[in-house]
């Protein structure tokens, strides 16, 4: 990390939103899903930061990536070792300034951090859904997020923001609910996955599914966990999130013991790092959820319904766009972001594009990179609430209460 980045990281930690408390919205109206099934009822766990203005025109939705959740900023307790996953960007005086915006982040359906997913009880059976939880898509998530928006009494968002899989949700929001999105910020994303990215996801899924402790997804019934499979899936994913330059700078060919051991145990520092990332992930994530999230990635293709024409798919979009990519991101390369930009321009939309110099790879969207934060802060500061959706009302959907 450069001196500038280190100073920025220290500065943002001192400007936290503080202690935050997750909330749960309960919905009793069925949600029809793309797969043909429906959820008869469901819960969404979310957090909010900042204050909603009187006009209801300053709300911002944050969409999380594959392993993310609702806890985007602040701390749940004073003893927490780390803040939320995007605390560097959300808070007083930060790029997504909570002195100005009312920020909402939720755990998506199929998640494992409180929203309805494989770990939740299926009302039909009285047992956890497990592998019987329906396949969910990015469009399904956006429909559920729209209901949460209405539950909160909002008529729309000043901005919808997300990185990676979160950026795909932003793109889907702008297409599915064009009147509800004033600004769309798509970071390190793509209009659909390449064959290579689908292949990475399939290898990860096979690592989980072929683990003897997976039991067809019913590992809870056997008091088991597919630890090795989920660990391998995370190790593979983590390699794709980093760049060769970042791995060379951080690990090189360093040996843990200082000399070659001529064996198959961990010898190189990069091996140790990947195993740590894999084993720690197993303790905080669910294997069935991981399978669902990767499938949502694979299925995302908003142009498909428009004869594979992304320009046509974007025809009704009304949002202004900021699209951001990172030079060393090979999972979703800058060219994939430029595809989105070209399609937006061809459909006559307003779009700003920034390609950020970084050696952090795909994970750069989570980093405190000074120029990246200036771009994001500058864009957000120029949002005019006079042109954003406004209106605060009571909930449209029957929610069955919330805590």
Swiss-Prot record:
Residues 58-366 form the AB hydrolase-1 domain. The active site is at 164 (nucleophile), 329, 362. Pathway: Amino-acid biosynthesis; L-methionine biosynthesis via de novo pathway; O-succinyl-L-homoserine from L-homoserine: step 1/1. One of its GO terms (biological process) is methionine biosynthetic process. One of its GO terms (molecular function) is homoserine O-succinyltransferase activity. Keywords: Acyltransferase, Amino-acid biosynthesis, Cytoplasm, Methionine biosynthesis, Transferase. Transfers a succinyl group from succinyl-CoA to L-homoserine, forming succinyl-L-homoserine. NCBIfam families: homoserO_Ac_trn, PRK00175.1. HAMAP family: MetX_acyltransf. This is Homoserine O-succinyltransferase. The lineage of its organism: Bacteria, Pseudomonadati, Pseudomonadota, Gammaproteobacteria, Chromatiales. The gene is metXS.
């Amino acid at each position: 990390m450069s001196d500038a980045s280190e100073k920025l990281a220290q500065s943002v930690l001192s400007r936290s939103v503080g202690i935050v408390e997750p909330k749960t919205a309960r919905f009793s109206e069925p949600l029809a899903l793309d797969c043909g099934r429906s959820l008869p009822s469901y819960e969404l766990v979310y957090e909010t930061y900042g204050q909603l203005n009187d006009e209801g025109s300053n709300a911002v939705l944050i969409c999380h990536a594959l392993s993310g959740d609702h806890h985007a900023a602040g701390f749940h307790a004073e003893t927490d070792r780390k803040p939320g996953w995007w605390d560097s960007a959300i808070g007083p005086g930060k790029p997504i300034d909570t002195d100005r915006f009312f920020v909402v982040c939720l755990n998506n359906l199929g998640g494992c951090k409180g929203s309805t997913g494989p770990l939740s009880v299926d009302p039909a059976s009285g047992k956890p859904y497990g592998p019987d939880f329906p396949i969910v898509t990015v469009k399904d998530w956006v429909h559920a997020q729209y209901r949460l928006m209405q539950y909160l009494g909002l008529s729309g968002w000043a901005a919808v923001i997300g990185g990676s899989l979160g950026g795909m949700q932003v793109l889907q929001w702008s297409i599915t609910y064009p009147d509800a999105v004033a600004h769309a910020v798509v970071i390190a994303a793509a209009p659909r996955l390449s064959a290579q990215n689908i292949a990475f996801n399939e290898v990860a899924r096979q690592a989980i599914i072929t683990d003897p402790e997976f039991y067809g997804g019913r590992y809870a019934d056997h008091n088991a966990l597919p630890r090795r499979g989920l660990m391998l899936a995370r190790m593979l994913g983590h390699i794709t999130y980093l760049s060769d330059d970042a791995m060379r700078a951080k690990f090189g060919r360093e040996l843990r013991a200082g000399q070659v051991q001529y064996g198959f145990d961990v010898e190189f520092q990069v091996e140790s790092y990947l195993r740590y990332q894999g084993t720690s992930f197993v303790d905080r994530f669910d294997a069935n959820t991981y399978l669902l999230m990767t499938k949502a990635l694979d299925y995302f293709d908003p142009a498909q319904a428009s004869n594979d024409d992304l320009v046509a798919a974007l025809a009704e979009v009304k949002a202004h766009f900021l699209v951001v990519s990172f030079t060393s991101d090979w999972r979703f390369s800058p060219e994939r972001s430029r595809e989105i930009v070209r399609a937006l321009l061809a459909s006559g939309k307003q779009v700003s594009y920034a390609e950020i110099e970084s050696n952090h790879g795909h994970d750069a969207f989570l980093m405190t990179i000074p120029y990246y934060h200036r771009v994001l802060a500058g864009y957000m500061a120029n949002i005019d609430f006079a042109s954003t959706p406004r209106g605060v009302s009571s909930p449209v959907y029957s929610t069955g209460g919330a805590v």
